[in-house]
Each structure stands twice: as structure tokens, then as C-alpha cells.
């Protein structure tokens, strides 16, 4: 408590500590320090217990802002051995899944941006600026299987630095624009049977957006925004991160690339760029790391380059004839 809670939260009155402020504190703490998940869980327990006592026992405040607090829904970088993908492995995976357009495009997106799993799976077409060749990373997706109102939710990125722009390399640009064409074609084919999703915004007491529930069209969506989700099944069905489950069983068992995760594409992206002369500050910005130390702890340092060249450097190293063939798409009428 003395090391983390008092220095950051002790300067506020209890009544001034909202759920949003406590959540920001937790995600920033997780981003800054490279401890195991169990360690952060202990900090969270102390925080929740303190506010429960302040509310229920002592009556210092009427509302408990820590009641629904939880750790960020992200992969635990510390507890897993990282896998550094090489070009042969990437080519093998893309060759095996060349007929699975959704997984292939999601894989290439993570491979060429270093985005977190939840950030990739939360992408909407509104986030992708094809004119300026930029991806606007603004949110992440997580599930609440026991919620009963809708499993998948869209929330803010891990930290404020998680909100960022990533320039698309030529390879990624072509992959995404062709995938969008295919999705539009499938919408026409399925017609009224194509599944459409909407965002049901959940607003806090302070009037600020907490998160958005992703719901299927149920006829009661007049005042909701269309989700325009990128990575959906051919019929429009959205399954969040589960889009990756079956392919990775094949990758582990059939292809023999064991102990690798979708998330490891993030580390592979960073390490490949750093080894090829990209400045670590630029890589940290692309990854959404607030502190360079976070990048240094997981990846290999290197020398200077321009931030916008990060995507181009990776493109030159990793793009093969196979990838170029896979991202080509022509609608078959």
C-alpha cells in the first residue's frame, strides 16, 4: 500500500476517486511494472477491501468506486515464454490458412502493426483511414460470458498511450482494402441474413462513456451506432477473440509451432524493427508503451530511424511473394 497506493491515490479525497480514475490507475500500474498477474491481483484486493471498508463499515463514502474494478483483460506478458516468429513460420502459417480470409487478415494486421490481440479484434472500419493509410487504435475488446446481456464489450485501450495512430505499410494496406471488398461482397450475397451489430453505450454517473456492449440487431437499436466490425465471419457473425482459437490449435498441433500465441506477433514486430535500425522510442510509440523501459524489458534495443519508417522497415524484411499472393483478392462472380 505504501509503495503504490498512497503515492498515487493518497493525494485525493475519497469522494474524488471515481471508477474511471481508479481504472486508469490500475492499467497504468500494470503497464509500468513487469510483475506477475498474481502480484497485481493482490494490489487490486487491497484496493477493493479498502473501499469496501470505507463504504460499508465506516460510511466515509456512499458509493464504492472499486466495486467493479478488475485487471485489464490482456495477455500476461510476464508469465509466458515469448515466441519470436521467423519468416519461415509466418509463411507456413499463412500458407496453411490461405483459405481463411478472416484469420489471415487478422494475422497480417497483428504481424505488421504490433497491435495487442484485443486491439486487433476490436477494429472497426471507422478506425481505418484508407485515404491517409492510418489505423487509429482507440479501443480493445473483452468478454463477459456471465453477463447475460451480451458477451463482448468494447472498452478503452490499456493506457492513454494506447490511443495512437499506426501507419499502414503497403502490404497491410492492400490486405485490409481487399478484405473490405470481400466483406462488402459477402454482405450482398447474404442480404437480410447478414448479421449486423451495434454499440450499446454504457454511461457512468459522471456522464462519461465506460464501455460499449456489442449487441446483435434485435430490432431495438434505433439510437445505437452500427459497429462496422472488421473481423467477422463470412455471415457477419462476431466472435471477438475466439476467431483465433481454432487456428492456433492447428498451428500448435498440426504445424508443430508450439507455445506460440497471437500476442507474440507483437514482440516479433518490435524485435524485427529494432534489429533493423528503428529507434526504440518510435517502436514504443507504435506499441502504445508509455515508458521506453517497458519496451526495453521485453524487446531488443537498437539505433535511430524515423517513426513513420517503422512499418516500411518491417515490410521490407518480412514481406514475401507468398504474402503478396495471399492478399490479392478478386471477386469471383
State where each predicted segment sits.
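N-terminal core-binding DNA-recognition domain of tyrosine site-specific recombinases/integrases
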Residues: 1-53, 57-59, 79, 237-243, ...
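DNA breakage-rejoining catalytic core of tyrosine-based enzymes
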Residues: 15, 61-63, 73-95, 136-138, ...
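Short, charged phosphate-coordinating catalytic segments
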Residues: 52-65, 90, 108-141, 281
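C-terminal catalytic core of tyrosine-transesterase DNA break-rejoin enzymes
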Residues: 56, 108, 112-119, 242-243, ...
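Catalytic-site neighborhood detector that most strongly recognizes the C-terminal catalytic loop/helix
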Residues: 76, 84, 141, 287-312
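Short, polar N-cap/turn motifs at the start of nucleic acid-interacting alpha helices
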Residues: 127-134, 258, 278-298, 308, ...
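C-terminal secondary-structure termini that scaffold catalytic or DNA-interacting sites
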Residues: 132, 143-145, 149-163, 170-172, ...
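Active-site/catalytic core of tyrosine-dependent DNA strand-transfer enzymes
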Residues: 169-257
Amino acid at each position: 500500500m505504501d509503495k503504490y497506493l498512497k503515492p498515487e491515490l493518497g493525494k485525493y479525497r475519497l469522494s474524488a476517486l471515481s471508477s474511471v480514475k481508479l481504472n486508469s490507475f490500475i492499467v497504468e500500474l500494470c503497464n509500468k511494472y513487469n510483475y506477475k498477474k498474481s502480484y497485481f491481483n493482490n494490489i487490486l484486493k487491497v484496493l477493493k477491501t479498502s473501499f469496501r471498508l470505507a463504504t460499508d463499515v465506516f460510511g466515509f463514502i456512499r458509493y464504492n468506486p472499486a466495486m467493479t474494478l478488475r485487471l485489464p483483460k490482456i495477455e500476461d506478458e510476464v508469465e509466458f515464454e515469448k515466441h519470436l516468429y521467423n519468416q519461415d513460420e509466418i509463411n507456413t502459417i499463412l500458407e496453411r490458412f490461405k483459405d481463411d480470409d478472416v484469420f489471415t487478415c487478422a494475422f497480417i494486421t497483428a504481424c505488421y502493426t504490433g497491435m495487442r490481440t484485443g486491439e486487433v479484434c476490436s477494429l472497426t472500419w471507422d478506425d481505418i483511414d484508407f485515404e491517409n493509410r492510418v489505423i487509429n487504435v482507440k479501443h480493445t475488446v473483452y468478454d463477459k460470458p456471465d453477463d447475460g446481456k451480451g458477451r463482448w464489450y468494447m472498452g478503452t485501450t490499456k493506457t492513454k498511450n494506447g490511443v495512437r495512430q499506426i501507419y499502414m505499410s503497403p502490404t497491410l494496406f492492400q490486405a485490409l482494402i481487399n478484405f473490405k471488398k470481400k466483406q462488402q461482397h459477402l454482405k450482398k450475397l447474404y442480404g437480410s441474413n447478414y448479421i449486423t451489430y451495434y454499440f450499446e453505450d454504457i454511461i457512468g454517473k459522471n456522464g462519461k462513456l465506460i464501455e460499449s456492449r456489442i449487441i446483435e440487431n434485435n430490432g431495438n437499436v434505433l439510437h445505437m451506432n452500427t459497429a462496422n466490425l472488421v473481423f467477422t465471419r463470412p455471415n457477419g457473425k462476431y466472435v471477438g477473440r475466439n476467431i483465433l482459437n481454432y487456428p492456433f490449435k492447428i498451428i500448435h498441433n498440426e504445424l508443430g509451432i508450439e507455445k506460440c500465441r497471437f500476442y507474440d506477433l507483437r514482440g516479433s514486430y518490435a524485435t524485427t524493427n529494432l534489429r533493423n535500425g528503428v529507434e526504440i522510442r518510435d517502436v514504443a510509440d507504435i506499441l502504445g508503451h508509455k515508458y521506453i523501459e517497458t519496451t526495453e524489458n521485453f524487446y531488443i534495443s537498437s539505433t535511430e530511424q524515423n517513426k513513420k519508417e517503422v512499418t516500411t522497415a518491417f515490410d521490407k524484411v518480412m514481406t514475401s511473394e507468398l504474402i503478396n499472393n495471399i492478399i490479392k483478392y478478386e471477386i469471383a462472380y
